[in-house]
Amino acid sequence: MRTKPLLWLTALALLPVVSAPLAGQPRPVGSEFRVNANTESKQHNPIAAFNAAGSALVVWENDKNGLRGRFYSRDGAPLTAELGLVANQKLTSVPAAGVEVIRKDPAVAFLASGDFLLAWTEERDDVSVDIFIEHRAVIDRDVYLQKFNAAGAAQGAPVRLNATTAGYQSLPKILVRNGADAVVVWQSDGRRVGPSGDGIFSRLVSPATGQPTTVETKLSSVPGLAANPAIAGAANGGFAVAWEAVDGSSQGVFARLFAKSAAPRGAEFRVNSTVQGLQRRPALTADANTGGWLLVWQGQAGSIKDSHVYGQFLGAGGSFIGPQIRVSQGVAQGQVSPSVAAVAGGHFLVTWLDYHDIFPVGLFGVEIDKLGAAVGAEVEINTEAINAHTRTSIAVSPSGGVLVPWEGFTNSQVAPGISARRFEL
């Protein structure tokens, strides 16, 4: 007897397989969404922060219009249109030529009042046009800071933080502390004034006024260029600062601890135990389990395809807790540019960018426990997977939700914009 084909089984086999997040994985809340409304230019370097009420602010740079921002509710709904925070400036009446002031590399931190501090790199470019080709030469870079109210309105004028103006000052980071002045750190490339001008510098800022309360202080002591600073606080008001610097024949990741008064607690020390290749782009977060910190970085032994994300737990006194750990587990692609944040349950979320044949292909993240072990599998953050994504950061809300913004392309745009996605842990 002939039997009919089991067509329904065939159809079932053709259905897409939809997998739920594994236990311990970051759980996405909806798909990625576009943050920037202005698409006339390129958008870069997003950073996000939550206020005490649970609203988020995403800030980024528009290479034509300056620093932009947008507020979101705790549920991810936009609370405002795109805001212009600090505009670029043309210092000449000659069209397409002259000196242009570019605001870039934003850093943002909320105060207890709901106001926030915004720091940035201010770059002056000498712009000229030859036929239809624009030429730019960087004149200088400085670090500025300004206070804003809870609605995003500027409070007072911007203030330059660096006292040393020779060379390039850039890449600020901000730490707001309870019961103490805020700390702003940045890197200085002081090649015009010799090696003493290179390094990581800081200045304390009054949360009430947004004005500096101390002189500029150099934090790094090893001669040579130090770059890409990161900062995270401790429960006692102290803090740690990390950066990358030349370490013999390679590049290493260093850290230094500071008391609540901002006085150093000992000298800087190398964190990475793997010394071959380039160890770069440190990211730092406080560890409530020990009163110390978790430091992650990009470790590269050869080409970018040999890069992975590594980490090291530090105790409250700077001692190593356990050995260096490998956070990212991909083998076919390089993992670079990590970000890290402490989340609920004493765990941590680490994100990074995956590369394949020198092309960025996606953003990934993993939750790890207090010992550095993965809690669940790695998860892809972006949903539009056919275009390049880069420059991710992490913000954690008071209720434990996570917002991850990044710079990248959508399927319908040819210039990079700012996207974001919400997660629960």
Task: Enumerate the language-model features and the residues they cover.
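Bacterial N-terminal signal peptides
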Residues: 8-17
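Extracellular, repeat-based ectodomains that mediate carbohydrate processing or recognition
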Residues: 24-425
